[in-house]
Amino acid sequence: MHFSSSSTSSTWTILITLGCLMLHASLSAAQLTPTFYDRSCPNVTNIVRETIVNELRSDPRIAASILRLHFHDCFVNGCDASILLDNTTSFRTEKDAFGNANSARGFPVIDRMKAAVERACPRTVSCADMLTIAAQQSVTLAGGPSWRVPLGRRDSLQAFLELANANLPAPFFTLPQLKASFRNVGLDRPSDLVALSGGHTFGKNQCQFILDRLYNFSNTGLPDPTLNTTYLQTLRGLCPLNGNRSALVDFDLRTPTVFDNKYYVNLKERKGLIQSDQELFSSPNATDTIPLVRAYADGTQTFFNAFVEAMNRMGNITPTTGTQGQIRLNCRVVNSNSLLHDVVDIVDFVSSM
């Protein structure tokens, strides 16, 4: 759409007039709250939950996949739904980052979820908040804890491929590298790292990310010595050296679709699937993580409590709030004519205060 000079002038007049209100709104919105949509979209959690329930009937992996999307979103410029954006002429998608390419999944489900939310509450719920709710609901539906997530985020105006490559933890990370990765985004407690790693209690991973552990760890020509020998043989059967590198393996062979504490039981038995998992218990630097692994393995509720706290801390990494960003209508693309959309968003936001 073409804007005349008078149209553009009017738009800027609106923005200037709202200047003081915008500042007040931005300051007021800095604190996320579970009640953010209680009046404007009270059924958003039910809509999100129903979408996931329907998808689980045909795709038991989707709960773990959605949780992973949220994690990978929050580690890159905060939880701003930047991971959901497709390529444009202005930026490259985070979907092409090393930690996401050919492994991040669930985007069509997010599309259907957003369409359902928009039908119920037009221009109200951000993709960032919707993905946060979806992650929580995915955990709960898989047998994990239930909690109300703090809300009030807005969506980014771009993706951050380079930042994704720099920030996302890799499956071959050592414990010092893992700690540095978490610390880099403000998650500096050992419990943040150990509890959030428990997200690997369900879901699957590709053989290509564990082949070195199984056959040529650190270029030694030998397997990772921290691997349980029986588990090693099981994994070699699932991932032959010259087999399908994209073949999938359960993170937790005990209860692969259930969100429970068996991940930590596995670590104690040296049955962590990827190196970065087993590092929490087997690294020489694990003096502050081993006690947490033991505690979570011994007590499901202890793990659940720590996981909820860590999820909320991760969800609060540099949130985009107030009049920053926008509320995308389609999670894959920045709103067209975003200036006018943002003006409407500001008016709606201020009027709701």
Curated annotation (Swiss-Prot):
It is found in: Secreted; Vacuole. The active site is at H72 (proton acceptor). PANTHER family: PEROXIDASE 33-RELATED (PTHR31388:SF141), PEROXIDASE 72-RELATED (PTHR31388). Heme b binds at H200. The lineage of its organism: Eukaryota, Viridiplantae, Streptophyta, Embryophyta, Tracheophyta. It holds the Pfam family peroxidase. GO terms for cellular component: apoplast; cytosol; Golgi apparatus; plant-type cell wall; plant-type vacuole; secretory vesicle. Preferentially expressed in roots, but also detected in flowers, leaves and stems. Substrate binds at P169. Disulfide bonds join C41-C121, C74-C79, C127-C331, C207-C239. Belongs to the peroxidase family. Classical plant (class III) peroxidase subfamily. The record marks R68 as: Transition state stabilizer. CDD domains: secretory_peroxidase. InterPro entries: Haem_peroxidase, Haem_peroxidase_sf, Peroxidase_pln, Peroxidases_AS, Peroxidases_heam-ligand_BS, Secretory_peroxidase. The gene is PER34. This is Peroxidase 34. Its cofactor is heme b; Ca(2+). Induction: Late-induced by Al treatment. Expression increased over 48 hours of Al treatment. Induced by oxidative stress. Up-regulated during a continuous drought stress. Early induced by benzothiadiazol, a chemical analog of salicylic acid. Enhanced expression following both compatible or incompatible pathogen attacks. Removal of H(2)O(2), oxidation of toxic reductants, biosynthesis and degradation of lignin, suberization, auxin catabolism, response to environmental stresses such as wounding, pathogen attack and oxidative stress. These functions might be dependent on each isozyme/isoform in each plant tissue.
